[in-house]
Amino acid sequence: MKIISPVARALLATTACLSAALPLSAFAGPEEQAAQMHSRLTGVKPSIEVLTAMAQDIASGDAGAAAERAMENDAFYDVTLKNLVTPWTNRDGDNFAPLNDYTATVIGMVRDDVDFRQILSGDILYTGASGLGLPAYNNANNDHYEALEAAGYPLQTALERRTQSSVTGLPSEATAGVMTTRGGAKAFFYAGTNRAMFRFTLMNHLCRDLEQVHDTSRPPDRIRQDVSRSPGGDSRVFQNNCIGCHSGMDPMAQAFAYYNFEYDVDNDPTGENGRLDYNGAGEIDPATGSRVQAKNHINSATFPYGFVIPDDKWDNYWREGPNMHLGWSEVLPGSGNGAKSMGEELANSEAFAQCQVTKVFKQVCLRAPEDSSDRNRIDSITDSFTSNGYRLKQVYAETAAYCAGE
């Protein structure tokens, strides 16, 4: 059951009402710009004291300081950030999905100005603070976070930073930020072949689906046995379509070879009581004879001569060809073992940084970038983001300052 606190419902409704009632063209002076900035960042009206202080900041030429004041409001975390993050946590992009460890971890990282790249590689997890009377974190359910949300505690003060490995028991070297949270695993390691984790990470954190990175020039040597080389009896379909996604995706998704989301298929088909499973050193899957989870070898008869995953070694074939323009880091090798290093590869790309800025721009400005002025501003905010510790609050502040004058 989806649990949405009464406070969150009220704030969501207020956000919609304020957005409709306060058109950009209505604002001119510092107080009007401050009011607009506060509503865009929080969805609620500022107090007279906060409005006055923000207006003074704007009048003195420091709109960023005004935005920082606005973000001290609980609604920035409970509504604005939650609205941004929640769709990333499920395949349907449902904005009203229950709070979980994926959502809470991102919100906590933003609050604490944690380098946002750690979202895909860090040994990091945010839980409800001790002393709140919540059920303990459980690897096999979401009760802790649903109780936190139902109680209506402000996330700005209720979240506590911990290491993922100490809470879940996952080895530190196997942690990979939100990808290895229970919420992430339930959504994207559920059934299938773990390619979903790669695809949705690409969509949510590089702002690109597979069609946008389609490249038929990459070698097909790592495409697995479960991909037909002649769909419908026509090999041209594989050569012109399938290869364009799988040649790059499959060698990257191999990083997830040791992960699975275990659940009772018959009695718990949606995995509400499922848990992340990881084959550590010395653990052997009887179906594969190695640490590789059995799901990675399914449908092997589709094309028996295809690639058989032996381990979790990944390689980024997109460092060459048209996808080199995603801006891969020159200091990283472009290959490695496991989800952590693969997450670092994605998070250190230029595409990752620009994606975060673009998402915030759309949320705060209530529109997509429209012209060269917008695009230039996104470029400058992205440069600031990457040069100053990947602080997402800074992105919000600079974006709100840009839109406040519209």
Short names for language-model regions:
Residues 21-23:
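N-terminal signal peptide c-region/cleavage motif recognized by signal peptidases
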Residues 65-252, 347, 351, 361-364, ...:
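Extended surface/linker regions that mediate inter-domain or inter-protein docking
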Residues 68, 168, 180-194, 228-229, ...:
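Electron-transfer interface patches adjacent to heme c in soluble/periplasmic c-type cytochromes
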